[in-house]
């Protein structure tokens, strides 16, 4: 039967139909192949926006650098990065005038953080450029490798465990004439297999020492590796994102801490808050503008879009901002904060994997690594790629491109928000000195601008002034993509405002369903998502009840745990039927053991085990939650667990759910296919790391031991703990004298070995 889809909307207010226009059902698009082309696009575009700047050469690396700061102001509407230093400083001064003491207080807060932060802060985060291996690694491994190299080069400040001391090592490493690193490489040998008598390739992993001179080391320390951003919906073209190395990360963290502290005190900032708190902040600004425009004024709102925010920002501008913000602070603090923008002014973009070539006739595939792009004959490339390579060639050094202007995606979100808010702040009447005035909201590159004026001409004048002020600070409001409505209807960071925020339910669609962690977590996350959407996103009771039934169905199909009395045959049905038949109280069985579903929309907040506990047979309780049962996982689980939810846009969100440890809370093992590759050496390092940590946790069994504050090593801590435990166990009669003596002897041997080392 054909249904005219417009009939669906006859009774629905227009604003509630927003959900239907979002591209958020189904799988998001992922990128394949290399990101080299996207990265070259970014580098070339960034230079084009600043092309009328001044060229200089970096004295250490020889990289050509373009500086657009205080460059010629644009005559047209094309995006450009010519920010004017004096304007930025003045905007900062006015921001401070409107918020007395804001910079001072934020500096004091940040100084405390700087002195307390430990180096393990840098292990957070996913992929990180590992400069020792010249490719991406998990953050913890990259940090471990960096520290290992530093120590073998005699840089030992990091041993205190404080981040600031690690950064001292980073600064000292940049003055070294050479740095010695260990690289992993792979040897292949053809040998004859004794059994099958065939030739096979044997791989062995070797480690070798390798010296980097000052120039090579600096290039690596200043390198951002690039990847393609995955899972971006609603875009035809992919784009490149950057991941910085460990030398840059620590400095960026402190700058962002300062900027975050400032953003928290600014009512126009959409960061660092999120969710309902953000909506409340926005609603306040709107209310303020509406209240003041009741009789004489008209009020309009621009749903704003900036052209290429990151590519027109400039690290030199951020340096000026930081210099101003910290002007009355101690020298050490000012120095440590100014290093991140200085490093970004000298950054190099790694071009990624390079290009893949296929010859259809000869069935050959070959990869052209990025390092070769500087001197390969361009006849092999198509027109668009040829143009890109020609343009980027003058900037290339060792397969990386010098990229002085621009900030890669997501590096200084907080600080760039401060810059944006400083323009919104200038809209007060005491600064505009005329009849129009403005206010608004800023969250990284997204903004909403509310302009009030006595008449339309005033509104137009206000918008023009805002537009031109932005240009002075290197921000380019897009006239094509921004649109204006009477205040009361606008969109900001995918929140749709229409006399109040409209629930944009489609954005939550990807997080419904079975997550695939394990039976216990999935049940808990599934009902929590439904509960949260009833609270935050206008999910009504009838729809929620339906969502719940669909979820349970989905869950049963995923884990093949249909009810014990069902006719559906699956791999597990034999076991489940057996359990069903021998259980007296069938209502007590968990859904994942073939039990009935007892959830409805009134009890979503109760973990399933608690909901059914009173209904369970005693022996079932004993098997399900007995800590001595080898299948009950107590390793990861605390009373509240975190799941990473992927919302339809924006970063992955952490979602809390209640976790009860049962036989269903298993943790799956990792895929081992990595063992045959050149990564194997790294994996072995990682396993050793893992073993040490596991051993350490055995000595300190509480899952939440406090971080050791002293400088004693892990080994010393374990030895002293072993001695204390042994003495207590011996005195209480839990162990025999011989065992006690043996433990003490082992401890002394370990200490002796450490001394000899």
Curated annotation (Swiss-Prot):
One of its GO terms (biological process) is DNA-templated transcription. A motif (Nuclear localization signal) lies at residues 187-195, 203-216. Residues 53-82 are annotated as: Disordered. Residues 249-256 are annotated as: Promoter-binding site. RNA-dependent RNA polymerase which is responsible for replication and transcription of virus RNA segments. The transcription of viral mRNAs occurs by a unique mechanism called cap-snatching. 5' methylated caps of cellular mRNAs are cleaved after 10-13 nucleotides by PA. In turn, these short capped RNAs are used as primers by PB1 for transcription of viral mRNAs. During virus replication, PB1 initiates RNA synthesis and copy vRNA into complementary RNA (cRNA) which in turn serves as a template for the production of more vRNAs. Influenza RNA polymerase is composed of three subunits: PB1, PB2 and PA. Interacts (via N-terminus) with PA (via C-terminus). Interacts (via C-terminus) with PB2 (via N-terminus); this interaction is essential for transcription initiation. Interacts (via C-terminus) with human PKP2 (via N-terminus); the interaction competitively inhibits the interaction between the RNA polymerase subunits PB1 and PB2. This is RNA-directed RNA polymerase catalytic subunit. The gene is PB1.
């Amino acid at each position: 039967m054909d249904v005219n889809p417009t009939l669906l909307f006859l009774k629905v207010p227009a604003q509630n139909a927003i959900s239907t226009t979002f591209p958020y059902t189904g799988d998001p698009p992922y990128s394949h192949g290399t990101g080299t082309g996207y990265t070259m696009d970014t580098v070339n575009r960034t230079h084009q926006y600043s092309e009328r700047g001044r060229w200089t050469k970096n004295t250490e690396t020889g990289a050509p650098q373009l500086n657009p700061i205080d460059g010629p102001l644009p005559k047209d509407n094309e995006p450009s990065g010519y920010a004017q230093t004096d304007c930025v400083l003045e905007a900062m001064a006015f921001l401070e005038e409107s918020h007395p003491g804001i910079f001072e207080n934020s500096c004091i807060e940040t100084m405390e953080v700087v002195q307390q932060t430990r180096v393990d802060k840098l292990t957070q985060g996913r992929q990180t450029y590992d400069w020792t291996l010249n490719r991406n690694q998990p953050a913890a491994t990259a940090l471990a490798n960096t520290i290992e190299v530093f120590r073998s080069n005699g840089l030992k400040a990091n041993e205190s465990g404080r981040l600031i001391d690690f950064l001292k090592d980073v600064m000292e490493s940049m003055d070294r004439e050479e740095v010695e690193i260990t690289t992993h490489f792979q040897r292949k040998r053809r040998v004859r297999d004794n059994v099958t008598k065939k030739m096979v390739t044997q791989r062995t992993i070797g480690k070798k020492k390798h010296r980097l001179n000052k120039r090579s080391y600096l290039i690596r320390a200043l390198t951002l590796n690039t990847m393609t951003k995955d899972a971006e919906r609603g875009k035809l073209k992919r784009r490149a994102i950057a991941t910085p190395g460990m030398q840059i990360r620590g400095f960026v963290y402190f700058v962002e801490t300062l900027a975050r502290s400032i953003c928290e005190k600014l009512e126009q900032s959409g960061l660092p808050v999120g969710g309902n708190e953000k909506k409340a902040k926005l609603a306040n600004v709107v209310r303020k503008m509406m209240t003041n425009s009741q009789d004489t004024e008209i009020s309009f709102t621009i749903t704003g879009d900036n052209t290429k925010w990151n590519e027109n920002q400039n690290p030199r501008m951020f340096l000026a901002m930081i210099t101003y913000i910290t002007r009355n602070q101690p020298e050490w603090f000012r120095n440590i904060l100014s290093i991140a923008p200085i490093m970004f002014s000298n950054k190099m973009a790694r071009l990624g994997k390079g290009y893949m070539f296929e010859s259809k006739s000869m069935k050959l595939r070959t990869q052209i690594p990025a390092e070769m792009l500087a001197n390969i004959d361009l006849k092999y490339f198509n027109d668009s790629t040829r143009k890109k390579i020609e343009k980027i060639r003058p900037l290339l050094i060792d397969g990386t491109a010098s990229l002085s202007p621009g900030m890669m995606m997501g590096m200084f979100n907080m600080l760039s928000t401060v810059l944006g808010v400083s323009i919104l702040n200038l809209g007060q009447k005491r600064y505009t000195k005329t009849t129009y005035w403005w206010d608004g909201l800023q969250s990284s590159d997204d903004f909403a601008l509310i302009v009030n004026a006595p008449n339309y001409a005033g509104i137009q004048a206000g918008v023009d002034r805002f537009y031109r002020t932005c240009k002075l600070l290197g921000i380019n409001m897009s006239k094509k993509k921004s649109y204006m409505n009477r205040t009361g209807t606008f969109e900001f960071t995918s929140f749709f405002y229409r006399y109040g925020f409209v629930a944009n339910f489609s954005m939550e669609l990807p997080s419904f369903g079975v997550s695939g962690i394990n039976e216990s977590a999935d049940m808990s996350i599934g009902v929590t998502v439904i509960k949260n959407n009833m609270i935050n996103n206008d999910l009504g009771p009838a729809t929620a009840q339906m969502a719940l039934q669909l979820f349970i169905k989905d869950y049963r199909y995923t884990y093949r745990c249909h009810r014990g009395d069902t006719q559906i045959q699956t791999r597990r049905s034999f076991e489940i039927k057996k359990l069903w038949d021998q259980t007296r109280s069938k209502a007590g069985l968990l859904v994942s053991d073939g039990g009935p579903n007892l959830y409805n929309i009134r009890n979503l907040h109760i973990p399933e085990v608690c909901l059914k506990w009173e209904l369970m047979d005693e022996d079932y309780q004993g098997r399900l939650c007995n800590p001595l049962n080898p299948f009950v996982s107590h390793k990861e689980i605390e009373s509240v667990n975190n799941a990473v939810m992927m919302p339809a846009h924006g970063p992955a969100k952490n979602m809390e759910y209640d976790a009860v440890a049962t036989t269903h809370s298993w943790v799956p093992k990792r895929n081992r296919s990595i063992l045959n590759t050149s990564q194997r050496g790294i994996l072995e390092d990682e396993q050793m790391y893992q073993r040490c940590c596991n051993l350490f946790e055995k000595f300190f069994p509480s899952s939440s031991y406090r971080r050791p504050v002293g400088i004693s090593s892990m080994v010393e801590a374990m030895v002293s703990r072993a001695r204390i435990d042994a003495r207590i166990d011996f005195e209480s009669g839990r162990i025999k004298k011989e065992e006690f003596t043996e433990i003490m002897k082992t401890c002394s041997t370990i200490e002796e070995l450490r001394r000899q080392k």
